[in-house]
Amino acid sequence: FRIASRSAKMGSATLRFGLLPDEGGQWLLVQHLGVAKATDFMMRKRIVDGETAHQLGLVHEVVDEEDLMDEAFKLARELAEGPQVAMRMLKRSILLAADLTWDQSLDEIAAKTAVTDHLPDAREGAQAFIEKRKPQFNGWLEGRSDPPMDGPAPWESASE
């Protein structure tokens, strides 16, 4: 998910300096814009504002600059409140769909559905629907301990 302010400036600056987009920018732009638009965008070294980026499909939403952080946090909360395991599996299915046939895609999502249908979040979603209330997903994740580690986490010092 990508949100931009109306005043945002976006572009690929590498060619301006005689460099190639070695971080994969060309691949990302081709995926989002198609070959012709990505070629135009990068070869002509275009810099676009938030509205134009939205029209091109580079961002999903454009908001006023003063609302950008509030909207970003609102989106983050919306995603965090969703059924995490099902969302992770759906995201993977969406990413795979471009390279699968129709039948393969149906088989792939059916395999994931066989798992998610038996998670507590599915029961909570169905119960919330029956009770006409907002579901409270991920409650079953609370209280679970992290897997054991041999020694401190990489960001902790051994003396803590």
Task: Identify the meaning behind each predicted range.
Residues 46, 94, 133:
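Glycine-rich beta-alpha junction loops
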Residues 126:
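Flexible, glycine/charged-enriched surface loops at secondary-structure junctions
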Residues 1-87, 118-119, 123:
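Crotonase-fold acyl-CoA enzyme core
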Residues 3-8, 59-107, 114-120, 136-159:
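C-terminal long alpha-helix characteristic of the crotonase
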Residues 23, 33, 47, 108, ...:
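A generic structural signal for solvent-exposed, polar alpha-helical segments
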